[in-house]
Amino acid sequence: MRKIIINGGKKLQGEVTVSGAKNSVVALIPAIILSDGVVTLDGVPAISDVDNLIEIIEVMGGSVKRDGETLEIDPRGVKDMPMPFGKINSLRASYYFYGSLLGRYGQAIVGLPGGCDLGPRPIDLHLKAFEAMGASIFYEGEAMRIATDAGQRIKGAHIYMDTVSVGATINTMLAAAKADGRTVIENAAREPEIIDVATLLNNMGARVRGAGTEVITIEGVESLHGTRHQVIPDRIEAGSYIAMAAAIGKGIKIKNVLYEHLESFICKLEAMGVRMTVEEDAIFVEEQGDLKPVDIKTSPYPGFATDLQQPMTPLLLKASGRGKIIDTIYEKRVNHVPELARMGADIQVLGGQIVYNGPTQLSGAPVKASDLRAGAALVTAGLMADGQTEITNIEFILRGYSNIIEKLSDLGADIRLIED
């Protein structure tokens, strides 16, 4: 079993560069199946989710070359076949293969997706969209087959999303890119990652308009070609390092940051009194003085991102006073709370809300990462704490934070990954 060991209490200083967006690349790689030529991605993060997606593409017959942060994928050999269930079941974003395989072959046979356990994340919206486009759904054991009649080309449709969903919006875009006719998505999600996927599709020859707004229109085309695409910076990784820098830094510059992707998050930091300077593509976070408590309520983009409430929680514990966190997106995103309490935090879950009272001096302790962003919170807490913190279940952390051990070590952290 692998663990992360942190000897905390050291102030961090220096520069850290944000990697490409995890939540983009896990959709971009399946999207490439739609291409009739080679596609190159630049800025690909070194995370286990990418490793798993590469393996899936290769098992299906595609060719992949990797050189550092550059990924070259030739999807022309990809076969119409059942997906490798083991990798699919461990990876929530595997559901993006539904849309891309439907668009290419008129059917997809896949295992049900896995990932972090954050409460209900039904794929009903995805399936409703596919059915509106002429597909039928069949359950076969632990797998699901989504298919048009006799593998015919999927049809364009007018689709209204009952709730705002990033995954369903992207999946519908993927299926619609090569559909017969026009697809309109109303009440679409607006996240930057959706714009990134639409940009790749358009560079491949698709006709997607309105990405980043509530209405997206896709005119289906018969074929897509190869291209080269730069993955956008990871706004969640950026926010995680910004919060970490405010909590335990004495001057840290976070590079490769797009401020416009983080406005609601940065507004909360400013309300706390966090001192920072926004540059063209970077944010410099100073060493902090006294901080004020704030209340946080997550909401779909451009609101406060659910993926940032856990990484920000340790910073909130430095504020003088009481505050609360309400996650309206994922109801079970509270599993970091008992772990922080084990480290001495005055924090608890009351009536579905996280209530904290600070400031708190944390102490090192053995803790367990229950999901990706909870793991990021525990890393920050370990850096803040007096003494040694041992984090287990770290595979979640490695799923989403590229080279996190090396990046923190370069800032002066006493952190290491060990095999037990």
UniProtKB/Swiss-Prot annotation:
Protein's UniProt keywords contain Acetylation: no
**GO CC terms on record?**
cytoplasm
Q: Origin, by domain of life?
A: Bacteria
Q: Keyword Cell wall biogenesis/degradation: yes or no?
A: yes
Name the UniProt key words of this record, in alphabetical order: Cell cycle, Cell division, Cell shape, Cell wall biogenesis/degradation, Cytoplasm, Peptidoglycan synthesis, Pyruvate, Transferase
Give the reactions, separated by semicolons, that this protein catalyses.
Answer: phosphoenolpyruvate + UDP-N-acetyl-alpha-D-glucosamine = UDP-N-acetyl-3-O-(1-carboxyvinyl)-alpha-D-glucosamine + phosphate
Top enzyme class, one word, equals transferase
Q: Which residues carry this modification: 2-(S-cysteinyl)pyruvic acid O-phosphothioketal?
A: C116
Q: In the record, what terms sit under GO molecular function?
A: UDP-N-acetylglucosamine 1-carboxyvinyltransferase activity
Cross-referenced Pfam families: EPSP_synthase
Question: Where is it localised?
Answer: Cytoplasm
One GO term under biological process is: cell wall organization
Involved pathway(s): Cell wall biogenesis; peptidoglycan biosynthesis
Q: Where does phosphoenolpyruvate bind?
A: K22, N23
List the active site: C116
EC code(s) of this entry: 2.5.1.7
Residue sites binding UDP-N-acetyl-alpha-D-glucosamine per the record: R92, R121, P122, I123, D124, L125, D307, I329
PANTHER family in UniProt: UDP-N-ACETYLGLUCOSAMINE 1-CARBOXYVINYLTRANSFERASE, UDP-N-ACETYLGLUCOSAMINE 1-CARBOXYVINYLTRANSFERASE 2
Q: Which NCBIfam families match?
A: murA, PRK09369.1, PRK12830.1
**Function according to Swiss-Prot or TrEMBL:** Cell wall formation. Adds enolpyruvyl to UDP-N-acetylglucosamine.
Give the family this protein belongs to, as stated in its UniProt record.
Belongs to the EPSP synthase family. MurA subfamily.
Protein name (Swiss-Prot/TrEMBL): UDP-N-acetylglucosamine 1-carboxyvinyltransferase 2
The gene is murA2
